[in-house]
């Protein structure tokens, strides 16, 4: 199936003609890059001659870092963190969080924010690609530029002759600073293709009904110099599908085949947002109204540290009672008679914050 993805092909930042390095001194997401491109005069280049330093950039009942400053139509320079207010910065939309600082900048008329971060050079490569789509579409701009910058970039913008740390930068006057800031962002849309792989064993008297057994065969791949192989997530599920397919083939040869047709399907794009199963749900090979169930296998490598030694004969079971009043009973009966595994249903709790039921490929069957 076709998928489309935007990718940054060029990203540059300079201050007074001095070039800084991607991931060593600055980074941005694709939405901000799109905003830069759309606001640029030509060729994805955006230039300003002044920025406004606003300290931590916090506006709340106790602080207003924008008091007396005109930031309308300008880029603000904001320090990461807060004034020793514990975990308040971790709250998603608190005034001291990144979202809170962006909202404060927007509300005061700024068109962008440069966040001074201590996390440079970055340990892991910043992503240069956006979400995947089934139809060709441009990454939406958020009409606000947000760029993470190093203390070196901030020092140059504030006219320091040497690199200053955050504590020293905080002593700078909240004011407008003259400096030629140039941002360049260009992108292209990649035309990609991915695949779901299907195989089936035809049923007998109910062969026009379909039971799906699924797993995803993609993982995170390579990030910077680290390869994420995905042995558990979800190599374990993929080989389980293959083993089950082989077992049912042997059973059918012995005259003990299934009554319903079993479809064994490995899907791609799960880590990108359940893309493969979503595509199948929108473009089914077999009628969805004749699909009786989907048993999805994800991360069954049994590596949970809470199970040790002889207790590793377990599996987490999630979602069997969401749409069916019989599946849990069947699961328990078959397990008690044959497998005798520990069926751990802790993550099936609707109040569980992980919400695993909504985070793997079975959900695209359930949603239909």
What annotation goes with each model-predicted range?
Residues 51-54, 75-79, 112-116, 145-148, ...:
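Structural recognition of the beta-strand scaffold that forms the well-ordered cores
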Residues 246-273, 297:
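Short helix-loop-beta-strand segments that form the rim/entrance of peptidase-like active sites
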Residues 1-75, 80-84, 330:
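Noncatalytic luminal/extracellular "stalk/propeptide" segments of secretory-pathway proteins
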Residues 28-29, 144-156, 161, 267-368:
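Metal-dependent peptidase/peptidase-like ectodomains
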Residues 42, 66-71, 102-111, 128-137, ...:
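Mature extracellular/periplasmic domains of secretome proteins
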Residues 32-68, 139-230, 246, 250-256:
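Soluble metallo-hydrolase cores and metallopeptidase-like ectodomains found primarily
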Residues 52-124:
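A conserved hydrophobic secondary-structure block that centers on an alpha-helix together
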Residues 1-35, 102, 115-134, 148, ...:
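Protein/peptide-recognition domains central to ubiquitin and immune signaling
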């Amino acid at each position: 199936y076709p998928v489309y993805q935007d990718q940054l092909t060029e990203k540059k930042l300079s201050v007074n003609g001095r070039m800084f390095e991607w991931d060593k001194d600055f980074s941005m997401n694709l939405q901000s890059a799109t905003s830069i491109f759309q606001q640029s005069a030509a060729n994805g280049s955006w230039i300003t001659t002044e920025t406004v330093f606003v300290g931590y950039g916090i506006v709340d009942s106790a602080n207003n870092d924008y008091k007396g400053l005109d930031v309308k139509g300008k880029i603000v320079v904001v320090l990461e963190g807060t004034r020793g207010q514990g975990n308040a910065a971790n709250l998603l939309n608190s005034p001291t969080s990144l979202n809170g600082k962006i909202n404060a900048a927007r509300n005061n008329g700024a068109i962008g924010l440069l966040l001074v971060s201590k996390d440079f050079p970055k340990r892991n490569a910043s992503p240069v690609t956006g979400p995947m789509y089934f139809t060709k579409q441009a990454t939406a701009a958020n009409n606000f530029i947000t760029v993470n910058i190093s203390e070196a970039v901030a020092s140059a913008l504030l006219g320091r002759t040497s690199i200053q740390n955050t504590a020293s930068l905080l002593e700078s006057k909240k004011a407008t600073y003259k400096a030629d800031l140039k941002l360049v962002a260009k992108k292209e849309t990649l035309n990609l293709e991915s695949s779901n792989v299907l195989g089936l064993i035809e049923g007998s008297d109910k062969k026009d009904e379909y039971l799906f057994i699924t797993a995803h065969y993609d993982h995170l791949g390579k990030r910077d110099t680290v390869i994420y192989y995905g042995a558990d997530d979800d190599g374990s599920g993929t080989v389980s599908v293959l083993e089950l397919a082989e077992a049912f083939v042997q059973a059918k040869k012995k005259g003990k085949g299934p009554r319903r047709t079993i479809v064994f399907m490995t899907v791609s794009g799960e880590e990108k947002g359940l893309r493969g199963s979503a595509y199948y749900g929108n473009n089914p090979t077999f009628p969805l109204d004749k699909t009786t169930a989907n048993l999805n296998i994800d991360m069954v490598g049994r590596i949970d540290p809470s199970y040790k030694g002889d207790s590793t004969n377990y599996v987490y079971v999630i979602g069997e009672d969401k749409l069916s009043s019989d599946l849990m009973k069947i699961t328990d009966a078959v397990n008690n008679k044959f497998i005798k595994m520990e069926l751990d249903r802790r993550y099936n709790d609707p109040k569980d914050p992980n919400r695993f039921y909504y985070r793997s490929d079975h959900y695209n069957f359930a949603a239909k």
